[in-house]
Amino acid sequence: MAYKSLNSITKSDIEALGISGDVSEKLLRDLEDIIHGSSTPPETWIQISRRILHPNLPFSFHQMMYYGCYKDFGPDLPAWIPDPKVASLTNVGKLLEKRGKEFLGGNYKNPVSSFSSFQEFSVSNPEVYWKTVLDELNILFSVPPKCILEKDTSGDNPGGKWLPGAYLNPARNCLTNGFKRRLDDIVIRWRDEGSDDLPVNTMTLLELRSQVWLAAHALSALGLEEESAIAVDMPMNVESVIIYLAIVLAGHVVVSIADSFSPREISTRLKISKAKAIFTQDVIIRGDKSIPLYRRVVDAEAPLAIVVPARGSSCRMKLREKDLSWNNFLGNARNLRGVEYVAAEKPAGAYTNILFSSGTTGEPKAIPWTNISPLKSAADAWCHLDVQRGDVVAWPTNLGWMMGPWLVYASLINGACMGLYNGSPLGPTFAKFVQDAEVSVLGVIPSIVRTWQNSNSTSGYDWSRIRCFGSTGEASNIDEYLWLMGRAHYKPVIEYCGGTEIGGSFISGSLLQPQSLAAFSTAAMGCKLFILDEDSNPIPPYAAGVGELALCPHMFGASSTLLNGNHFKVYFQGMPTFQGQILRRHGDLFERTSKGYYRAHGRADDTMNLGGIKVGSIEIERVCNSVDDSVLETAAIGVPPPSGGPEQLVIAVVFKSPEFSNPDLNLLKKSFNSEIQKKLNPLFKVSSVVTLPSLPRTATNKVMRRVLRQQLTQTGLNSKL
């Protein structure tokens, strides 16, 4: 849609959007005042977003203002611009005001102007940067590290050894009161679905610590071996957070399993991790439905299960003979209630959590988090999302995925409060919780935002306490995120992209930089990015271009092992070198724009991201090839829509005979969807089907899916190639 420039907009243009005459007249007067008083489009947009726009105005008017303001501006429209005074009060701003000249010398100017230089400093001076951040986070070591980074000279571990010699316990760091907080600070605010008109529940640091200690004592009473793997397959609620911290405090290793998994998927993860026990819930309550969870754990032939009731104090079904109810489990340590549990301090490289890639029919990668990974999560939150004491951080997620543990560490280590809604995040009850819990940092994924906008489920709720949004999981859409910003009076969206194997992000945004929608403004602190050209050579720094993203191998908190795979082969083998260092593979296609922003373009290999779940093309093709006898072969392609947003699944079909050249593609699409959802994942959906006389192939007969992706992106999803 073509938008008028701001000075061309008339009262009738505004009225055409459904705004009354009187209101339209006032809006136009205010707009004219702003235009006359501003010199640049960003300055104009700042004033419009502060003085004119509010959530009750039609979104079409927000779009008229945004696109009208930046008409003829070019790419990368700034949707949010930092205020220098506010920027100086952020975590990084305060640090730079105090020590900027020490770090950057005469090049230091102010937190906003010097942030990019500070990011580069964090890469070139890891000893100084990470020691500073660990001090800012008040990280407690029972034995301090000999140094920050011990680089590898053998070539076996290109990422080097971080914090060598250090001993610590991440859970202890979550539960310690110090200069960042007091024992009476509220550290969890939560609400159960169905109790939406009741006050928000709260838990203080003192209460959380007491309950974690009790659960850790009860774990010790089970008599498990040291450093046993213990699974958690539960919704993200207060009990699961207590359990997670207790496992880590006791020196065991959490095995993260998503509460949506089938018995087969649960079983696979239990076997890979060699879990000795599992915490689960009897059922998951969503509205008037009770979804079985313990039953799936039993069908997975799980080891000893400790079962938490979803409601009340007793489970809804009979347990297996050796399984324990939550109450009976805690009862084993009833005499130790209120007694401190002395944390099990472990080496920095010891495992604390086993997480998994989102494998479907293939075996998922088992990725161990060490005791350093939680520090990376907390440091990212400190720097990029500016999480501080007094913040309430909410992020709809699950302990089965990395953002669950991330939320625990990002909030508690930074002295903030977690906001947990035990229910669906898609409807108005979650929006009400955000209001009532006074959430200040709200994490989202684009598909949730799309649902909110389409259902108007946030209408009428006050989100003015929000300071910033975080977004992860999949590519976002510009207009959907413009709408999201408008719900909170144009607070920024910080895009956050990394991976389970990173422990956080490698690319993000910052509250010290202008933020463009659906774009990243900076490499994460301590990370250096490379965009590779067609010959796998890094393009010049700061040059615009598109290519596969590679990473500097030295990343604090990143993985160095896989339980069921060759880590070097997966992440380093075959990668180019830069200044004598082999680069780390990530696998996404990224664009660096002429203005220095980054945009994600999906997977560079034959993997795609569907609704935040990575899946291989071959897995989908195997299903589609057997759907109909007329199909010779298929290619599954993830294609980003023209307006941005999550990849859409397109199936390119080659038929066995020319007589099938005009089939009913809608019927075929329904068949593909039915089989894919049955055999792979109920959340996967085919967006369109296209026909081809043959698939493009390399000289070695490999399907060139990247070529198909480029053609589909250029011609549109419904074209016949």
UniProtKB/Swiss-Prot annotation:
Gene3D superfamilies associated with the record: 3.30.300.30, N-terminal domain of ligase-like
Location in the cell: Peroxisome
Q: Which Pfam families match?
A: AMP-binding, AMP-binding_C
Q: Where is this motif: Microbody targeting signal?
A: 719-721
Tissue specificity note: Expressed in leaves, stems and developing seeds.
Molecular function (GO) terms listed?
ligase activity
One biological process term in Gene Ontology? fatty acid metabolic process
Does the keyword Ligase feature in the UniProt annotation?
A: yes
Predominantly, its location class is other
PROSITE patterns, from UniProt? AMP_BINDING
Q: What is its EC number?
A: 6.2.1.-
Keyword annotations of the record: Fatty acid metabolism, Ligase, Lipid metabolism, Peroxisome
- UniProt cross-references to SUPFAM superfamilies, sorted A to Z: Acetyl-CoA synthetase-like
Q: What happens when the gene is disrupted?
A: No visible phenotype under normal growth conditions.
Keyword Nucleotide-binding carried by entry: no
Which terms in the GO cellular component ontology are assigned? Answer: peroxisome
Q: Which PANTHER family does its entry note?
A: ACYL-ACTIVATING ENZYME 17, PEROXISOMAL-RELATED
Similarity comment: family membership? Belongs to the ATP-dependent AMP-binding enzyme family.
Q: What does this protein do?
A: May act as an acid--thiol ligase that activates carboxylic acids by forming acyl-CoAs.
From the Swiss-Prot or TrEMBL record, give the protein name.
Answer: Probable acyl-activating enzyme 17, peroxisomal
This protein's species is: Arabidopsis thaliana
Tell me the lineage of the source organism. Answer: Eukaryota, Viridiplantae, Streptophyta, Embryophyta, Tracheophyta
Gene name in the database record: AAE17
